[in-house]
């Protein structure tokens, strides 16, 4: 059973965001924006086999409240209406969509019928504090430590699939993140994340600019199981952008084993005058 007020809020939100997205004037302590998109998909394993057709109507709502110059509160909603063949094949699909990996379960299937279901997820819910060179963010947030465009072994807090093309914001984590900026081109970060299985990820990162490249080093503890160390870079190589990352994982339970797992990726990309883009990226895992 669901609350009528929640459904009313979602319906009202769909109407507002479908008509237009807007932000309040700068003098207002509140801001709101969003969008409405739809994606049709076809699933098949051969041209002669059966084809499954699905549609997702995706609405996003972003709210921010600027309490003071140094304090911001944010809540962002991802509302999706699923229709089609996958929605008609039982509860497994809707249960997978409803799954929330965070400490708090902030995903709900508001309506479930035989041929469609409506899910809403709060993927950002945080308080942000900043003062001079220091910034702290507490709550569900995106911690993006990746440098490459396809695979991101440095992104130990928010792993995601490159093929999840309808989710440009990427998933968030229930975390505490501290940042200190020694200079305009460098940052020291410390982040701690928990999840629903009580696994802990904690890591530190140092990023700086040298020789025209953004270079970073990180070390930490991943998913209550692995010691982690890594590095990443992004910069220019002639007319191309050159990016890469490497991360080493070593299980604590097998500490005497000196091999561990190394994931290395590197790639080049280029944006042309007509705004088209070409990219190549390779990955190695031992």
Segments from the language model and where they lie:
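Bacterial N-terminal signal peptides that target proteins for export
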Residues: 1-8
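Outer-membrane beta-barrel biogenesis signature
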Residues: 21-33, 87-93, 226
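Signature for the C-terminal beta-barrel architecture of outer-membrane proteins
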Residues: 32, 132-133, 159-286
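Outer-membrane beta-barrel proteins
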Residues: 43-47, 84-88, 145-150, 199-201, ...
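Flexible, surface-exposed loop regions and adjacent strand-edge segments
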Residues: 50-53, 89-98, 154-158, 250, ...
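Outer membrane beta-barrel
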Residues: 64-186
């Amino acid at each position: 059973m669901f609350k009528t007020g929640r459904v009313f809020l979602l319906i009202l939100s769909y109407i507002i965001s479908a008509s237009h997205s807007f932000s309040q004037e700068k003098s207002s302590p509140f801001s709101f924006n969003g969008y409405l998109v739809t994606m049709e998909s076809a699933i098949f394993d051969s041209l002669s086999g059966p084809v499954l057709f699905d549609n997702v109507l995706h609405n996003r709502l972003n709210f921010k409240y600027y309490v003071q110059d140094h304090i911001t509160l944010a809540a962002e909603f991802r509302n999706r209406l699923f229709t089609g063949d996958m929605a008609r094949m039982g509860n497994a699909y809707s249960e997978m969509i409803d799954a929330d990996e965070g400490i708090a379960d902030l995903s709900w299937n508001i309506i479930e019928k035989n041929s469609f279901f409506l899910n809403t997820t709060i993927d950002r819910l945080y308080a942000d504090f900043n003062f001079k060179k220091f910034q702290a963010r507490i709550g569900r947030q995106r911690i993006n430590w990746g440098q490459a465009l396809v695979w991101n072994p440095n992104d130990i807090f928010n792993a995601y699939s490159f093929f999840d093309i309808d989710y440009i914001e990427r998933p968030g984590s229930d975390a505490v993140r501290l940042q200190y900026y020694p200079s305009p081109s460098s940052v020291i970060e410390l982040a701690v994340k928990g999840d629903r299985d009580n696994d802990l990820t904690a890591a530190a990162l140092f990023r700086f600019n040298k020789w025209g490249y953004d270079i970073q080093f990180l070390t930490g503890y991943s998913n209550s199981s692995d010691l982690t160390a890594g590095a990443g870079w992004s910069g220019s190589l002639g007319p191309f952008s050159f990016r890469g990352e490497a991360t080493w994982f070593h299980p604590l339970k097998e500490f005497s084993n000196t091999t561990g797992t190394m994931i290395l990726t590197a790639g080049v990309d280029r944006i042309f005058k007509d705004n088209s883009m070409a990219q190549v990226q390779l990955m190695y895992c031992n």
